[in-house]
Amino acid sequence: MITGIVLAAGTSSRFGRTKQLLELDHKPFVQHAVDAAADGSLEEVIVVLGHDAAAVEKALRGARTVLNPAFAEGQSTSLLAGLDAADPESEAAVVLLADQPRITADHVRALVEAFRVRRSLIVRLRFRDGPGPALLSRDVWEEVRKLTGDTGAREIVAAHPEWVEEIAVDEEVPLDVDEATDLHRLR
């Protein structure tokens, strides 16, 4: 079993309103991430909520939610909340961000297929202009639990490049929507 963890707890401070609820193609950003996970052959999808949790949860379908009461302490706390909520039988987790609505089921499937074939500790998409979502084997979750503050698994990737298998994707990184100008470029 592989779990999808959608990080959707952030305050959207640079954007000024809850990004997770912004719509693209008549669907909230957070639902795009859930659909990519579910359609990408992940058996379990967990959305980690924090800021504006009730409104984000109301906009969701097809995912289990977990509340991160420490979301203001940074992304690492949401990642840990997602890992803690994962099924004990889960052998890996694909981590998706709620503000990247152009990540697709095909992207998720590429991570899963690479993991199933080579059993790498970390599998990460490498777009033409930078890194994308990653799959974290359960074997590295204890290392992930050491993270603090507003950081994700990038610190572990930087510290242990030998653990990482990168899957080349011949496209630009799907836009991470942080500011209003990003939203206009996305549409």
Regions found by a protein language model. Name each.
Residues L22-L24, L135-S137, V177-D178, L186:
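Short beta-strand-to-turn element immediately C-terminal to the catalytic PLP-Schiff-base lysine
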Residues M1, K146-R187:
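Conserved alpha/beta core of the MobA/IspD/sugar-nucleotide pyrophosphorylase nucleotidyltransferase superfamily
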Residues M1-G130, L135, E143, E162-V169:
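Nucleotide and nucleotide-moiety/phosphate-recognizing core
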